[in-house]
Design a protein with these regions (language model features):
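NAD(P)H dinucleotide-binding glycine-rich loop of Rossmann-like/cofactor-binding domains
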Residues: 37, 46, 85-148
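C-terminal hydrophobic helical "lid"/dimerization subdomain
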Residues: 284-340
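Short glycine-centered segments of the SAM/dcSAM-binding site in methyltransferase folds
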Residues: 85, 143, 167, 232-233, ...
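Short amphipathic alpha-helix with an adjacent loop that forms part of the alpha/beta core around
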Residues: 195-207
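Glycine-rich beta-strand-centered segment in the early N-terminal region that forms part
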Residues: 22-39, 51-93
Length: 340
């Protein structure tokens, strides 16, 4: 089978190599899937830049989410059957024609979804669900700020917040503002042209924000924290600001950390504000039952039509470098999907 290896850190054009490797064999409690589509996540870009501490050493096959058909099951496997259409998490290894993963990370695909849409619900959908329903509570009337609201996670968070009857502010670049309005965002803010904090203060008559979902980090996080009302929560689940320019080095990570600012527990206590960090890889490793729950609940929402995943663009697997550039340059709306 073919697999796409990250052979060295740096620019996408020279980072990847497609190689042949054996088809994996399912052990007890595992499933082998013939992959139709796999997804790109911003963590893949961070890993390619050499800035993701959880990534294995090179050469490594990246990839967290796939959709395809069950090829084989391990000993005593009774949950899934050969030939079933499934969607699944992978702890790396997703950039391949066949993947092996644990049964708890696999779910049957609804008939209403194609492989690309299913891929868009695995990591992005589960992350959005965990952020919105496990890490915090969204109350009717809450003012919610979602950064990168046109992205794979952001677009699903918008839909979840609107389902809870929240007032939603969303940031995106100029070309994506109409998409945000179509999703139901109450105030779409062009972060490339405007200071989102000033726009929100002017639009809300200085009313504060109850919940922020932030995948950007750095100064965006710091400025978002200043907008929080007493009782407000900021859920941080990414650091896209870490990636900038063409250099790969640890200095950018240090600059990012400094940009977040320094907070003490007493500061949070006195202001009655909360900072909640979300790393879905840690959830997968330490609370796999919660990850499975998130995927099940997202599937229920998709089947009921309360959320609709957006597939922004599909690339063929041999265009992996082009797809990485597309995601890294923030051209994407919704999920970027690769197809074999």
């Amino acid at each position: 089978m073919k697999a796409i290896y990250l052979k060295k850190y740096g620019n996408s054009a020279s980072a990847f190599e497609i190689k042949e490797m054996p088809i994996p064999i399912a052990a007890k409690g595992e499933v082998v899937i013939k992959v139709a589509c796999f997804g790109l996540n911003f963590a893949d870009v961070v890993a390619r830049r050499g800035l993701y501490p959880d990534a294995p050493a090179n050469p490594v096959v990246l990839g967290y989410d796939v959709a395809g058909v069950v090829e084989s099951v391990g000993e005593d496997g009774a949950i899934f059957k050969i030939g079933q259409r499934v969607m699944a998490f992978t702890r790396f290894g997703g950039y391949a024609e066949y993947v092996k993963t644990v049964e708890s990370g696999v779910a049957l695909m609804p008939d209403t979804l194609d492989f690309a849409a299913a891929t868009a619900l695995v990591t992005q959908g589960s992350t959005a669900y965990f952020c919105a329903y496990q890490s915090t509570v969204l109350n009717a009337g809450d003012r919610v700020l979602i950064h990168a609201a046109a992205g794979g996670v952001g677009s699903l968070l918008v839909q979840m917040a609107k389902q809870q009857k929240c007032i939603v502010y969303g940031t995106a670049s100029t070309s994506k503002l109409n998409y945000l309005k179509q999703l139901g965002v109450d105030m779409a803010i062009d972060y490339t042209q405007e200071d989102f904090s000033k726009v929100i203060r002017a639009h809300s008559n200085d009313q504060k924000i109850d919940v922020v979902f932030d995948s950007i980090g750095g100064r965006t996080f710091k400025n978002s924290f200043k907008l929080l009302a007493p009782g407000g929560r900021i859920v941080t689940f990414g650091a896209a600001e870490q990636i900038g320019g063409n250099k790969t080095n640890k200095l950018s990570a240090l600059k990012l950390a400094w940009g977040f600012g320094i907070f003490s527990p007493i500061q949070l206590l006195l202001s009655s504000k909360a900072i909640i960090g979300v790393n879905m890889l840690k959830i997968a490793d330490n609370r796999p039952h919660i990850l499975s729950l998130c995927l099940r609940e997202v599937l229920k929402m998709a089947e009921a039509g309360t959320i609709v995943p957006t597939v922004g663009k599909i690339f063929s697997a041999d265009k992996i470098a082009e797809a990485h550039d597309y995601l890294e340059n923030r051209q994407s709306v919704g999920k970027v999907v690769m197809a074999w």
